[in-house]
Design a protein with these regions (language model features):
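Charge-rich, well-structured scaffold segments of protease-associated domains
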Residues: 4, 12-15, 62-211, 229, ...
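Generic solvent-exposed, charged/amphipathic alpha-helical segments
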Residues: 196, 200, 258-259, 271
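Mature N-terminal segment immediately following signal peptide/propeptide cleavage
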Residues: 1-25
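His/Glu-based metal-binding/catalytic segments typifying zinc-dependent metallopeptidases
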Residues: 124, 141, 211-267
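A cross-taxa feature marking solvent-exposed loop/turn segments within ectodomains of secreted
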Residues: 19-21, 57, 179
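Serine-centered coil/turn micro-motif
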Residues: 130, 147, 249-250, 267-271
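M16/MPP (pitrilysin/insulinase) zinc-metallopeptidase core fold and M16-derived inactive scaffolds
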Residues: 23-85, 151-155, 263-280
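Primarily extracytoplasmic ectodomains and periplasmic/lumenal surface modules that are beta-strand-rich
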Residues: 18-21, 33, 192-194
């Protein structure tokens, strides 16, 4: 069942009679594409900040652990997703926690500086100090020229995170972490009407906030091949190819399936072709 609360929050519930666990997921329609090109990496930074507690609940993980639960999150270009899995009898603990940090995240300068250091170190380890680490970034910048898909969720450069001010971070939170920009889903062996009632109890009192302006630019159609050669101190040469496809509702939305068939692992067609040609020693 699906319901939109008075403050704009979309709630989707599903009764699962098999599991004794409840899965509570909240998706914010705020990803890397919603960032200022001069301040990239904010969506991923918030994935970290959202676990740093609120004024009412300073330690987010402790109540989850006391409820015998687990939690995590991930960010991509289109959205940021948070989830908690715990025994169904403790489902309100998850709703309490998620509703609290949707409105009352405590972003102190000290917490911000700590998470900025963590994210910058992650950037360096995974993308700058690792062989081939910057290859996906080079490919993105080649494939997209104006659309924000041209940068990864980690951001364009560590300096964007290093230079982020508390006011800029707070503005991003207020603009994107609001009821009408989120989807709450609950799956548990609980009556669906009961789950909707619980969602209303914990989330409907939250005030909505004005929507952030959408400045996402349309990517021009690519009319000619693009190539880039980057010289790096790496053990072997690698080649990456990328092809534009239609949106998720277009017939070409099956492209990820073809990608898996062609290049998804040792049994894929391209792997056999490269190996049989003698170009690869693997």
């Amino acid at each position: 069942k699906k319901k939109i609360l008075a403050n704009g929050l979309t709630v989707v519930v599903n009764r699962d009679p098999v599991s004794k666990l409840a899965a509570v997921n909240i998706l914010y329609k705020a990803g890397a594409r919603n960032e200022n090109p001069e301040r990239t990496g904010f969506a991923h930074l918030f994935e970290h900040l959202m676990f740093r507690g609120t004024r009412r609940i300073p330690n987010f993980d402790l109540p989850v652990q006391m409820a015998c639960g687990d939690n995590n999150a991930f960010t991509n270009n289109d959205y940021t997703d948070f989830y908690i899995t715990l025994p169904k009898d403790n489902v309100e603990t998850a709703l309490w926690l998620e509703s609290d940090r949707m409105e009352g995240l405590d972003i102190t300068p000290e917490k911000l500086e700590t998470e900025k250091r963590v994210v910058i170190e992650e950037f360096r380890q995974r993308y700058l100090n690792q062989p081939y680490g910057d290859q996906p970034m080079l490919l993105r910048a080649l494939a997209y020229k104006v659309h924000p898909y041209r940068w990864a969720t980690i951001g364009l450069t560590p300096e964007h995170i290093a230079q982020a001010t508390p006011d800029e971070v707070q503005a991003f939170y207020r603009a994107h972490y609001r009821p009408s920009n989120a989807i709450l889903s609950i799956s548990a062996d609980i009556d669906e009407e009961k789950m909707l009632d619980l969602a209303e109890k914990w989330f409907e009192p939250l005030a909505n906030r004005p929507a952030a302006p959408d400045h996402i630019r349309q990517e021009p159609v690519q009319t000619a091949p693009r190539r880039e050669v980057a010289e790096r101190d790496v053990p072997a040469t690698t080649v990456s190819l990328a092809f534009h496809m239609g949106g998720r509702t277009s017939p070409t939305s099956t492209s990820p399936t073809w990608s898996d068939l062609l290049a998804g692992g040792d049994s894929a067609a391209l792997h056999h072709l490269v190996k049989s040609s003698g170009c690869s020693r693997r």
